[in-house]
Amino acid sequence: MRVFTLIAILFSSSLLTHAFSSNYAPVGISLPAFTKECLYYDLSSDKDVLVVSYQVLTGGNFEIDFDITAPDGSVIVTERQKKHSDFLLKSFGIGKYTFCLSNNYGTSPKKVEITLEKEKEIVSSHESKEDIIANNAIEEIDRNLNKITKTMDYLRAREWRNMYTVSSTESRLTWLSLLIMGVMVGISIVQALIIQFFFTSRQKNYV
């Protein structure tokens, strides 16, 4: 009986953690230079709590502006020249919240990944002992899964940034090499013309 209960707990926990993890997913947004993009989220209860995080993956200096506006139009969060950030947003009233990202720095387009995750509601305490143990096990698995997911997202973002930096450096080195070659060719042509001018002027003097 205990084995069957344990199997049932593990099975239900795997289903619930999958459900919790599938409730949200990172949204990729492309921000051309000097543009602004906004996302919207409706909170239906004053007890709702929203976990908000974003990170810049590629583009220039990886810096953007970020604002959160409450349903009444008041700006509750303002960030400038940030590469990444995390918020725990408690309700400022029921209604539609606006999350805006602006690329106001540099002429490079930027790719941003943003996550809006509604925090789980606290389960009622009027439960049996077995249900409490099962819920604790589920919550522990869910917390560990969230930690792993956030760590993987962070590492992936760093990999994107490093790849973009390497690609940008390679492009700059290529153009710098072409510029140096052009300068060397130009100097060689000027030297040849100067030498030719000297020889031509000497021949005229002899004549």
Curated annotation (Swiss-Prot):
A biological process from GO: endoplasmic reticulum to Golgi vesicle-mediated transport
Membrane topology: Single-pass type I membrane protein
InterPro entries referenced in this protein's UniProt entry, alphabetically: Emp24-like (IPR015720), GOLD_dom (IPR009038), GOLD_dom_sf (IPR036598)
Tagged with keyword Transcription regulation: no
Annotated ranges, domain GOLD: 36-118
Highest taxon, organism lineage: Eukaryota
Endpoints of the signal sequence: 1-21
Localisation: Endoplasmic reticulum membrane
A Pfam family this chain is assigned to: EMP24_GP25L
An annotated GO cellular component: endoplasmic reticulum
Lumenal compartment spans: 22-174
TM ranges: 175-195
Keywords: Endoplasmic reticulum, ER-Golgi transport, Membrane, Protein transport, Signal, Transmembrane, Transmembrane helix, Transport
Cytoplasmic side: 196-207
Keyword Ion transport included in the entry's annotation: no
Family classification: Belongs to the EMP24/GP25L family.
PANTHER family named in the record: TRANSMEMBRANE EMP24 DOMAIN-CONTAINING PROTEIN
Biological role: Involved in vesicular protein trafficking.
Record's miscellaneous remark: Present with 2710 molecules/cell in log phase SD medium.
Protein name (database record): Protein ERP4
